[in-house]
UniProtKB/Swiss-Prot annotation:
Entry protein name: Tubulin--tyrosine ligase
Cofactor(s) in the UniProt record: Mg(2+); K(+)
EC number of the protein: 6.3.2.25
Catalytic activity: C-terminal L-alpha-aminoacyl-L-glutamyl-L-glutamyl-[tubulin] + L-tyrosine + ATP = C-terminal L-alpha-aminoacyl-L-glutamyl-L-glutamyl-L-tyrosyl-[tubulin] + ADP + phosphate + H(+)
Keywords attached to this entry: ATP-binding, Ligase, Magnesium, Nucleotide-binding, Potassium
Gene Ontology cellular component annotations, sorted alphabetically: microtubule; spindle microtubule
Binding partners and assembly: Monomer.
Domain named TTL: residues: 3-370
Main EC class the enzyme belongs to: ligase
Family the UniProt entry places it in: Belongs to the tubulin--tyrosine ligase family.
Function: Catalyzes the post-translational addition of a tyrosine to the C-terminal end of detyrosinated alpha-tubulin.
């Protein structure tokens, strides 16, 4: 009999995983403060990593990688892309981005001039001068100059401003209380017809205890309800595809797709009929490359291969596609929710790949088979 504890009662994904484990008959749930467990389904923040792996004779597995925030916080992701040797030279799939701290945080501002040594020791150096230099250069060259400011820890469309005015973006951030990212806005996205609408793509990725990377074969497009207008920044419903914003502010929510969600099979049919291309060849190949590049760049920092406990993690990668069919990584979510119709299959995959590979069913000598729902990258 294996044992597990649940420390996050708000996760719908791990509520389903918990249900599946109990249904096997060989998993028992313990009180959340019991230290002698095999599996912890923990909370994303303040997880007690330091207390794991110290119970004699007990293998312990936890559902997060310590340090995964290097990918999952917007400012940290920008820093990773700029400083990682694996990414900084070849990363053409991440929008131009700058980390900006509100001036009320008393953060040193990095000089933009060449030849001046940057204060490397201070990890909170502000990049606003670099942003302004790029902004002014684009303005002089007559390039598209729309940018988006996003709170590093924000979610559900909160803490966001889209503007073509640098001063407006910086004033917005300086009025806030936390670090933001200013990112080049994708001004020419691929649009869905009918409706001339924006979308983004959510892909779910599972990293097991051996740092094998699995992509869930199903993905979802989160679609806008209103026609895209690059000049109207005030209408969030045509720019931001977050469910919360679409549901609350758009009178056309659900008009084109139920719940403003389109799944991969329908999207592939759309691409085939509208553009004479396939999802796999035109978009998924790029998505797989980006996912693998990101995760391999942080493996040395977060892998648990040589620690007394082991980790796995489900991640949500969010992408956009431009009109040239180039895929751009927008952000990575460390505790992603899941579309309702996908819960059963996705959560069964977590059990089969991430949990049963460490704690196999006691009545079988067979190695658990990789579910067809996941593709190993």
């Amino acid at each position: 009999m294996y044992t597990f504890v649940v420390r996050d009662e708000n996760s719908s994904v791990y509520a389903e995983v918990s249900r599946l484990l109990l249904a096997t008959g060989y998993w028992k749930r313990l009180r959340r403060d019991n230290p002698r467990f095999n599996l912890m389904l923990g909370e994303r923040n303040r997880l007690p990593f330091g207390r794991l792996g110290h119970e004699p004779g007990l293998a312990q597995l936890v559902n997060y990688y310590r340090g995964a925030d290097k990918l999952c916080r917007k400012a940290s992701l920008v820093k990773l892309v700029k400083t990682s040797p694996e990414l900084s030279e070849s990363c053409s799939w991440f929008p131009e981005s700058y980390v900006i701290y509100p001036t009320n945080l008393k953060t040193p501002v990095a000089p933009a001039q060449n030849g001046i040594q940057l204060p490397v020791s201070n990890s909170r150096t502000d990049e606003r001068e670099f942003f302004l230099a790029s902004y002014n250069r684009k303005k002089e060259d007559g390039e598209g100059n729309v940018w988006i400011a996003k709170s590093s820890a924000g979610a559900k469309g909160e803490g966001i401003l889209i503007s073509s005015e640098a001063s407006e973006l910086l004033d917005f951030i300086d009025s806030q209380g936390q670090v933001h990212v200013i990112q080049k806005y994708l001004e020419r996205p691929l649009l869905l017809e009918p409706g001339h609408r924006k979308f983004d793509i959510r892909s779910w990725v599972l990293v097991d205890h051996q740092y094998n990377i699995y992509l869930y074969r199903e993905g979802v497009l989160r679609t806008a309800s209103e026609p895209y207008h690059v000049d109207n920044f005030q209408d969030k419903t045509c720019h931001l595809t977050n469910h919360c914003i679409q549901k609350e502010y758009s009178k056309n929510y659900g008009k084109y797709e139920e719940g403003n969600e389109m799944f991969f099979e329908e999207f592939n049919q759309y691409l085939t009929s509208a553009l004479n291309i396939t999802l796999e060849s035109s978009i998924l190949l790029q998505i797989k490359h980006i996912i693998r590049s990101c995760l391999m760049s942080v493996e040395p920092a977060i892998s648990t291969k040589h620690l007394p406990y082991q980790s796995f993690q489900l991640l949500g990668f969010d992408f956009m596609v431009d009109e040239e069919l180039k895929v751009w990584l927008i952000e990575v979510n460390g505790a992603p929710a899941c579309a309702q119709k996908l819960y059963a299959e996705l959560c069964q995959g977590i059990v089969d790949i991430a949990i049963s590979s460490v704690f196999p069913p006691p009545d079988t000598e067979q190695v658990p088979q990789q579910p067809a729902a996941f593709v190993k990258l």
